[in-house]
Amino acid sequence: PFTQGFRQGWGNSHALVEGAYEMLQTLHQRGYKLYAASNSFGHLQRMRLQLAGVLPFFEGTYISMDIGYDKPDRRFYDFALNDAHLSADEVLMVGDSMTTDIIGAQQVGIDTCWFNPTHRPIGTTQPTYEIHDLLSLLTVLP
């Protein structure tokens, strides 16, 4: 059926945003613990990360279909923090969605970095940081 074909095709899609591999590799080498957080299907998202060659950079993955809550539900973030044994002040959420990533993380006290490659207006919610290319994150996290 269409849904199965869509999921399989989506799972095989693994092109990275420019600078993503270098950014993840550098942060991993600097000793940062990296976690992926996504609203998607767990096995498909992990397959995409594996095919892109970046899964080894992550300590863990937090996927909505596995957890039972979607971002921006605070229970998603609470689960991830608890599971990773981290407090909100030890985490920086980097994401491209103002609603699910930035607002969701802020509601539990996590600092945020909005990846905004198209220079969209920020609006009323202010992220802690804003970057327009992923390699800029390397200056935010020395």
Show the residue positions of the predicted features:
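Asp-based, Mg2+/Mn2+-dependent phosphohydrolase catalytic module
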Residues: 21, 25-28, 33-142
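Metal-dependent phosphoesterase signature
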Residues: 1-19
